[in-house]
Amino acid sequence: MNAESGENAGGGCPLGHGAGAPRKRPSNRDWWPEALSLTSLNQHSPRSNPYGGDFDYAAEFNSLDLDAVIADLHKVMTDSQDWWPADFGHYGGLFIRMAWHSAGTYRITDGRGGAGGGQQRFAPLNSWPDNASLDKARRLLWPIKQKYGRKLSWADLFVLTGNVALESMGFKTFGFGGGRADTWEPEELFWGPEGTWLGDERYSGERQLHPGLGAVQMGLIYVNPEGPNGNPDPKAAAVDIRETFARMAMNDYETVALIAGGHTFGKTHGAGDPSFIGPEPEGALIEDQGLGWRSKFQTGIGPDAITSGLEVIWSQTPVKWSNYFFENLFNFEWELTKSPAGAHQWVAKDAPEIIPDPFDPNKKRKPTMLTTDLSLRFDPIYEPISRHFLENPDEFADAFARAWFKLTHRDMGPIARYLGPLVPKEQLIWQDPIPERDHPVIDDADIASLKQKILGLGFSVSDLVSVAWASAATYRGSDKRGGANGARIRFAPQKDWEINNPPLLAQVLQKLGEIQSDFNGSATGGKKVSMADLIVLAGCAAIEKAAQDGGVNVAVPFTPGRMDALEEWTDAQSFEALRPVADGFRNYYHESHFMAPEEALVDKAHLLRLSAPEMTVLVGGMRVLGANAGGSQDGVFTHRVGVLSNDFFVNLLDMKNEWTATEHKNRFQGLDRKTRQPTWTATRVDLIFGSQSELRAQAEVYGMADGNEKFVRDFAKAWDKVMNADRMDIGKPADQFSQKLSA
């Protein structure tokens, strides 16, 4: 046992309060590491933002002189600094890597990662082995950030700098959209189960990568450039490349373009033994001021720099756009060698020395490649794409430009969030486009009339609430995808998901479609109503009825203006990533999920940008409204299904109920303590609100004698937040983790 955990030979406190104990104060997490954490629901509080919760970054960015920023960045590119000299006199390669690694953490499975927020500034990303020396890139940019201040976020600066680096080396980029507001604390994300850098405990079976992760080893962005676990096998490496790039939403064509385009520039660094390298930024000394990986190998910089341990230069013109990557890849045969640092890499066999030295104009080298570069030649799928790009350099340039734009903008959501004069006009399917509104919206009188027609269709409260939730709750605050706007629940794959009860969904959509046709065919003044609006309005009408049936009159907010997406502009395969594997709000959990049900609930709430109170009130409301997937009665602690009441909390907290586990590990049976008769059934998601102390405190608020009306009004407000989470047209999206509920 290491010194931090201590040896507990005497049977005392497991945290070791002795002379040799660490100075770290034990947290609740140290005592109860398996307890459900709500930390993710409390992230990014306005209290951590030095500009305050009302800071409008979009307005600041729109006042920025972007041309001046770009001009200044062009100067930085060739202004080599003695403390970190530029390879070939140009920082382009370094800044491309910085931007790539800022954006490349994106994973399509949950939309997390990516360039938004500027998370590369914080742990653990700032200290990942794959991000070695990018601390220097950020310091090189400090004069730019310092000059433009609040008008230019670090997150936007990282991506913009990558674009300018490409442009300064003769490449034409596809465009740039600003609008990435900075975050001010690390994102608490699951990056893997390992406790050591480059660990690979994330695999099961025959190299089955953990479903929630996007990289092959802890601390890497994608793959090990030496090959799987350092095995220099290009074909095996191709398997890893295909898997990890697909999890970043890239197909084979885009993958080849990205790798080859990025490796047209710059070099890798492996001048000496990695043992000379000091700790990463988070582990460095205080006097190092956030800089890590200090090297004691000779000068430690310039020609003596060690970063990845690989020493590779791909192109004859490493600071100029060319097709040399593919020309060299196919024109030479390759033999395995090792870098000065001992890393596996490849050198062109019997090749002339045609590659420039980064610091000595009188020296030349042979072409070199990474194992993962050779994958583009020797993998049977990548090879024809690579050869096509070799023979069609203009198409390659266009493919790289588009793939780079996708890489650096994939987590930004709808194009409505893109800011600035460099936003391309072309519509791209991966942006999940929704048509702009071209008609007046419905007014209050229309809304009231439509509600009555909807309630007259004969569907239950449960039916209408379930469909509205299914439409809206696909939203992910991580990459701003999903949500009710666009009504893509009408299309594959969402219309066929089992959790959405396809037969009922089809019936509801058909009847709402009839109402839409009647209204749009008779409304005056050009007014129209979208299916997206009608689906949400149906849920709102049902909730108002459910509240009224319980004795509380509440107006559920409704803001019209959603539009309907087109099926031809809906990438079904891409939307499959939004399929719920668990949705605790509907008491749905698939056994394939890698999280416990209650953890999956918190994860879902985090993606919906809900606070703990909002999560609590929504679960309680959805249960009594009968909105469980598949009509399950688990957690439906009420005899008045369809009435919006606080019954879930009242009965959960009632001590007459005793809970026992069943043969199903996630299901429990409630018994009357006196009669031993069955009362309710529940899942782990239901019982966590009585078990976890913070959630029990929330539940008690709504279970009190005076809690019912507060519960109804808080439910309506939290419901409205979910329904509008993706509404980029009515203000800030739901990227805050809390909102003020009723007093």
From Swiss-Prot:
It comes from the Bacteria. The record marks 97 as: Transition state stabilizer. GO terms for biological process: cellular response to hydrogen peroxide; hydrogen peroxide catabolic process. Formation of the three residue Trp-Tyr-Met cross-link is important for the catalase, but not the peroxidase activity of the enzyme. There is a cross-link at residues 222-248 (Tryptophyl-tyrosyl-methioninium (Tyr-Met) (with W-100)). The active site is at 101 (proton acceptor). Heme b binds at residue 263. The keyword Nucleus does not apply. GO terms for cellular component: cytosol. Residues 8-19 have a biased composition (Gly residues). It holds the Pfam family peroxidase. Disulfide bonds: none annotated. It is an enzyme of class 1 (oxidoreductase). Binds 1 heme b (iron(II)-protoporphyrin IX) group per dimer. GO terms for molecular function: catalase activity; heme binding; metal ion binding. Keywords: Heme, Hydrogen peroxide, Iron, Metal-binding, Oxidoreductase, Peroxidase. There is a cross-link at residues 100-222 (Tryptophyl-tyrosyl-methioninium (Trp-Tyr) (with M-248)). Its EC number is 1.11.1.21. Residues 1-29 are annotated as: Disordered. PANTHER family: CATALASE-PEROXIDASE, HYDROPEROXIDASE I, BIFUNCTIONAL CATALASE-PEROXIDASE. Belongs to the peroxidase family. Peroxidase/catalase subfamily. Bifunctional enzyme with both catalase and broad-spectrum peroxidase activity. Homodimer or homotetramer. NCBIfam families: cat_per_HPI, PRK15061.1. This is Catalase-peroxidase. It comes from Stutzerimonas stutzeri (strain A1501) (Pseudomonas stutzeri). The gene is katG.
